[in-house]
Swiss-Prot record:
Residues 192-212, 320-374 are annotated as: Disordered. Residues 342-354 have a biased composition (Acidic residues). The N-terminus might form a beta-propeller domain involved in specific binding to phosphatidylinositol 3,5-bisphosphate (PIP2), leading to the association of the protein to the membrane. The L/FRRG motif is essential for the cytoplasm to vacuole transport (Cvt) pathway, for the recruitment of ATG8 and ATG16 to the PAS in nutrient-rich medium, and for its recruitment to and dissociation from the PAS under starvation conditions. Keywords: Autophagy, Endosome, Membrane, Protein transport, Repeat, Transport, Vacuole, WD repeat. The PI(3,5)P2 regulatory complex regulates both the synthesis and turnover of phosphatidylinositol 3,5-bisphosphate (PtdIns(3,5)P2). Necessary for proper vacuole morphology. Plays an important role in osmotically-induced vacuole fragmentation. Required for cytoplasm to vacuole transport (Cvt) vesicle formation, pexophagy and starvation-induced autophagy. Involved in correct ATG9 trafficking to the pre-autophagosomal structure. Might also be involved in premeiotic DNA replication. One of its GO terms (cellular component) is endosome membrane. It is found in: Preautophagosomal structure membrane; Vacuole membrane; Endosome membrane. This is Autophagy-related protein 18. The lineage of its organism: Eukaryota, Fungi, Dikarya, Ascomycota, Saccharomycotina.
Length: 500
């Protein structure tokens, strides 16, 4: 086991049909269906290996094992001819590479270089803030040709004075009155929680410290950049905290986002920036490693460091109505509970976790098959019953829109990656088109679930959605999920990406 290479990079191609993997020895390319390795190179460690759909074009960045494999050098390879098409060297380390059939984007720590992929001509350079995690996403669709990346942090000055009270609020009429107000503020010394007056620390300017305390750093915005016009189109206010993951849908119309906290997943309309879905992944913070849409935008897969993949069902809801009502809920929430600092951001995220879109559910409303009994589900049911009871009780005292905040929107299906390691892992999922599965081919597999689902016994074939997951441990898992009932996904196949 010690001779196995170290995995530096792993990803699906744009349509989820292939897997590219960079290791300490080189890189490998796999086909998903049927599974098998069809290309391998061992010239040196690779940190980035990106494919252009299922073509022979590869974008490869080395790990610095030798001068030819510098982490600052991008190599465009043709796997059919086993040749290097071109090489481009950048001033700093390359953190991410994304491409579609018309554009190629190279992300450095503080710049994004955009090229015409047909001739590798530099079209534009974007100056950004520090993006050490290499977070960006490009639309695979050349018609809705967008690039998204985190916006530079914004400093917001709070209008609330730290020691202001309702006893000294005055209406500003003249400069003299303004001077009086300033004097009043400067004379006041707030009391601490013990009731004793706080002493000013030597060498600290009260005015400076107050200005610093009243500043809030907002770093949860996302910039949408049009790769055709080479202009930014909008800034989406996605989260309060730092962005951890971004993903554009296959058609480039939807954007999924997650913050560092990892409890809330949001989906936005790329055309107008409106929020169309909001999902609660869980209660406890976790690191989101990837987001991925199905090709038809019906499902969204969220992979986290807790080795769990949550599947959310988006359905075909009306975007405008949903976004308007969600925005109204946000306004109500902001009016009810004003927030002014980092200390309250966690509470705000918890409140926002409960923001519901239940009042907008279409006929495609996610339904989890309640007949499937598991210990985890019984525990969740008990917890959810208490939550709903509390929501109904509190909802009786609030307006309809406010009470809707109390009902969370949960995942439609989920799976737990099978691993013996106790360490956090990174995973990426790809949701394929539905398939017809013969029960006779997998009798043992469906026998375990037949007792909890009568439909398995009354038909020869089942319509299932394949979900492929690749992990940083070097495995590819193929799960299947019921597109109507959801629930626990069933493991169908498992392969090692490291073994020969």
């Amino acid at each position: 086991m010690s001779n196995l290479p170290i995995i530096n990079f792993i990803n699906f191609n744009q349509n989820g049909s292939c897997i590219s993997m960079g290791t300490s020895q080189g890189f490998k390319i796999f086909n998903c269906e049927p599974f098998g390795r069809f290309y391998q190179d061992e010239e040196g460690g690779c940190g980035i290996v990106e494919m252009l759909f299922s073509t022979s074009l590869l974008a490869v960045v080395g790990m610095g094992d030798n001068p030819a494999m510098s982490p600052r050098r991008l190599r465009m390879l043709n796997t059919k001819r086993h040749s290097v098409i071109c090489e481009v060297t950048f001033p700093t380390t390359i953190l991410s590479v994304k491409m579609n059939k018309s554009r190629l984007a190279v992300l450095l720590q503080e710049q994004i270089y955009i090229y015409d992929i047909s001739n590798m001509r530099l079209l534009h350079t974007i100056e950004t803030s520090m993006n050490a995690q290499g977070i960006m996403s490009m639309s695979p669709n050349s018609e809705n040709n967008y690039l998204v990346y985190p916006s530079p942090p914004k400093v917001i000055n709070s209008e609330i004075k730290d020691h202001a009270t309702t006893n000294n609020i005055n209406i500003k009429k003249t400069d003299a009155v303004d001077d009086t107000i300033k004097k009043d503020y400067s004379l006041q010394v707030p009391s601490d929680i013990t009731g004793q007056q706080q002493q000013q620390q030597p060498g600290v300017d009260p005015a400076t410290s107050n200005n610093t305390a009243n500043k809030i750093i907002k770093n949860g915005d996302v910039i949408v950049f049009n790769l055709q016009t080479l202009q930014p189109t909008m800034v989406i206010e996605a989260h309060k905290g730092e962005i951890a993951a971004l993903k554009l849908s296959a058609d480039g119309t939807l954007l999924a986002t997650a913050s560092e906290k990892g409890t809330i997943i949001r989906v936005f309309n790329v055309e107008n920036g409106s929020k169309v879905y909001q999902f609660r992944r869980g209660t406890y913070p976790t690191k989101i490693s990837s987001l991925s849409f199905s090709k038809d935008n019906q499902f969204l897969a969220v992979c986290s460091s807790s080795k769990t993949v949550h599947i959310f069902k988006l359905g075909k809801n009306t975007v405008d109505n949903k976004s308007n009502e969600l925005n109204s809920d946000d306004e109500i929430e902001d009016d009810l509970v004003p927030r002014y600092g980092d200390e309250d951001e966690e509470d705000e995220e918890i409140d926002e976790e409960a923001t519901s879109i239940n009042s907008n559910h279409s006929s495609k409303e996610p339904v989890v098959d309640a007949k499937r009994s598991t210990v985890g589900r019984m525990i969740r049911k008990s917890s959810q019953r208490l939550s709903r009871k509390a929501a109904r009780t509190l909802g009786a005292y609030f307006p309809i829109k406010v009470s809707s905040i109390l009902e969370p929107s949960r995942h439609f299906a989920s799976l737990k990656i099978t691993t013996s390691s106790n360490q956090p892992i990174k995973a990426i999922a790809a949701i394929d088109d539905p398939i017809e599965l013969s029960i006779k081919e997998y009798p043992d597999l469906f026998e375990k679930n037949a007792s909890n689902n009568g439909d398995y016994q009354n038909s020869d074939t089942l319509t299932m959605v394949p979900i492929r997951v690749v992990s940083s441990e070097g495995f590819m898992y193929k799960y299947i999920s019921d597109p109507e009932r959801g629930g626990d996904c069933i493991l169908l196949e498992q392969y090692s990406l490291l073994s020969d």
